[in-house]
Amino acid sequence: MSEFAPICIYLVISPLVSLIPLGLPFLFSSNSSTYPEKSSAYECGLDPSGDARSRVDIRFYLVSILFIIPDPEVTFSFPWAVPPNKIDPFGSWSMMAFLLILTIGSLYEWKRGASDRE
């Protein structure tokens, strides 16, 4: 049992360390609002109206997919950022193939009109 004592202590202390900061605001806060401005609309000045769960147009998702394309491109381009005389032919051709696949995908989305606004 003595070899498990540090683990038991950790299992008791770690929830306390995380729950105490979560509980402190409830102890020190007051429910009475003396300032009506605190419950008013923030910044825009308009009271919310309508349903918050409105439908989102599918074109929003297409545009978000278009912005995902540069992320792996940049990530996979970092190892390629070495002097040209230090890149072996396999690394060079694999990067060219990767860029070709990304270019074909971008051209396909462009041809399909994914970035067109209506």
Curated annotation (Swiss-Prot):
A GO cellular-component term linked to this record: NADH dehydrogenase complex
Name of the featured protein: NADH-ubiquinone oxidoreductase chain 3
Keyword tRNA-binding annotated: no
EC class of the enzyme, as a word: translocase
EC code: 7.1.1.2
Signal peptide: none
Gene: ND3
Organism: Solanum tuberosum (Potato)
Keyword rRNA-binding: no
InterPro entries: NADH_UbQ/plastoQ_OxRdtase_su3 (IPR000440), NDAH_ubi_oxred_su3_sf (IPR038430)
